[in-house]
């Protein structure tokens, strides 16, 4: 099976130093079996490489489980087609409203007010009775993820997040995919190393340009929704917009695409648990985002 070539050098250097795949697989299967709840696992499936491996491990371990995909409406079309074709048995969960509706009626998501994950991914599954959630989260992905426990209880949701491949490195993931001859989205072969929402406040620089060039329709729709939302009244009731002197929709789009990173340097990735305007920022500046 042909695997993406752009990271092979890195994977080979990792393989010389790290735990063999077989041991990682055995440990992950034991983890799933040890913590299996009587009613079974809720498996979060995104169609990316990590969730592909995680779902396969659930199948191999023969634990009771159901797989669910949060259909955000802003995932890459290539990814959505892949899920439909290769995983027709995965249950789709849809948000109450579209991403564009939430923007035009409330506000675009920001690094410090990232409502999109909750509204598009988490809320649709809240009423699901399966409270043990298996996720393909790996510590290697970011320092923020590495700092959190492998078994994590989310009190306000009454859910337990289980991370069977938490200690896996990227080469483990691709080696497993190769050994089991698993299909994966073609975007990986085109140079994309992580797949997620086409529109995201954490995209900047080269990655943002890649997304804009690859999926221009999404960005035209996004800008249309922002224009429907922005108005002089929005500016007048927003201390945040006043603070950054954002008076026009063009200035806002410039800020959204490029200046958020400078304005909120302490918010570095979308894995972070957001505490809006911590460290001296005035939380009241985000009141305009609270009524979503």
Where are these regions (language model features)?
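ATP/NTP-dependent adenylation/nucleotidyl-transfer catalytic domains that generate, transfer
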Residues: 179, 185-292
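ATP-dependent adenylation/nucleotidyltransferase module used to activate substrates
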Residues: 1-180
């Amino acid at each position: 099976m042909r695997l993406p070539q752009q990271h092979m050098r890195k994977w080979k250097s990792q393989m010389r130093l790290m735990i063999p795949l077989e041991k990682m697989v055995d440990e992950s299967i034991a983890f799933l079996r040890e913590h299996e709840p009587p009613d079974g696992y809720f498996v979060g499936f995104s169609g990316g490489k990590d969730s592909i491996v995680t779902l396969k491990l659930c199948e191999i371990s023969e634990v009771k489980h159901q797989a669910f995909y949060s259909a955000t409406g802003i995932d890459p079309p290539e990814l959505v087609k892949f899920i439909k074709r290769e995983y027709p048995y995965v249950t789709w969960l849809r948000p109450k409203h579209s991403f564009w509706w939430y923007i035009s009626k409330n506000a675009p998501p920001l690094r410090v007010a990232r409502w999109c994950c909750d509204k598009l991914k988490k809320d649709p599954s809240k009423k699901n009775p399966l409270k043990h959630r298996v996720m393909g989260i790996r510590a290697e992905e970011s320092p923020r993820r590495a700092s959190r426990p492998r078994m994590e209880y989310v009190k306000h949701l009454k859910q337990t997040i289980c991370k069977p491949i938490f200690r896996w490195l990227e080469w483990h993931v691709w080696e497993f995919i190769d050994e089991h001859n698993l299909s994966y989205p073609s975007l990986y072969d085109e140079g994309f190393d992580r797949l997620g929402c086409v529109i995201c406040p954490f995209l900047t620089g080269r990655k943002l340009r890649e997304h804009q060039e690859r999926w221009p329709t999404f960005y035209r729709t996004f800008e249309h929704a922002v224009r429907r939302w922005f108005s002089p009244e929005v500016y007048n009731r927003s201390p945040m917009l006043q603070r950054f002197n954002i008076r026009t929709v063009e200035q806002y789009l410039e800020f959204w695409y490029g200046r958020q990173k400078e304005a909120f340097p302490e918010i570095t990735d979308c894995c972070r648990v957001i505490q809006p305007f911590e460290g001296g920022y005035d939380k009241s500046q985000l009141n305009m985002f609270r009524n979503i």
